[in-house]
Amino acid sequence: MTTMAARRSEAAPAPQQLRGSQLKQLRELFRRFDMNGDGSLTQLELAALLRSLGLRPTGDEVHALLAGMDANGNGSVEFDELAAAIAPVLTTQTHLVDQAQLLEVFRAFDRDGNGFISAAELARSMARLGQPLTFEELTRMMRDADTDGDGVISFKEFAAVMAKSALDFLGVA
C-alpha cells in the first residue's frame, strides 16, 4: 500500500456506516458536482455544491471547509472524505433531505398556502411543535431567514436556512 493510500485509509474511514439509501444520495450529490469526473471536489466544485444548497459561502469559508475535510492533504475532497465528514450526523438518525421532503415541511409552516411563511405562521408552527418563541427569538429567526427583506420567508430562503442548519450541526459551516 502506498503512503498516500495508507494515509487516506487512516484519515478518512470508508463510509460503511451509512445506510444504502444515504450512501446512494450522497454519492449522487458528489457526482453531480464533480464536474470533471476525477473523483474529487476542488474548491470551486465544493463551492458550487454549497450554493446548490442555498448557501453563499465566501471563498475563505469554502477554503476552510475544504481544508477541514481534506484528510489526505491533496487539496481536494474525495467521496470518502465527504462521507466521513457527514456520516456521524447521518448515522444519528439524520437523513439527507430531498427537495420533496423539504417542500412538505415548508408547506406545513405555510398555513395559508401562499408560498411564503409569515412571522405569524412561523410563531404558530413553532408553538405547535412544542417550541414557542419569544418575540425576540421570532424577530431574530425572521431577520436571519428573510434574506431579501420582504418580511416573509420564501421556499428558497427556507431551504437555505435548513441547509445552513445542517452544516452547522455537522460542524462544517
From Swiss-Prot:
PROSITE patterns: EF_HAND_1, EF_HAND_2. InterPro entries: Ca-binding_regulatory (IPR051111), EF-hand-dom_pair (IPR011992), EF_Hand_1_Ca_BS (IPR018247), EF_hand_dom (IPR002048). One of its GO terms (cellular component) is cytoplasm. The keyword Glycoprotein does not apply. Ca(2+) 2 binds at residues 70, 72, 74, 76, 81. GO terms for molecular function: calcium ion binding; enzyme regulator activity. Keywords: Calcium, Metal-binding, Repeat. It comes from the Eukaryota. Ca(2+) 4 binds at residues 146, 148, 150, 157. It holds the Pfam family EF-hand_7. Residues 21-56, 57-92, 97-132, 133-168 form the EF-hand domain. Ca(2+) 3 binds at residues 110, 112, 114, 121. The keyword Zinc does not apply. Potential calcium sensor. This is Probable calcium-binding protein CML14. It comes from Oryza sativa subsp. japonica (Rice). The gene is CML14.
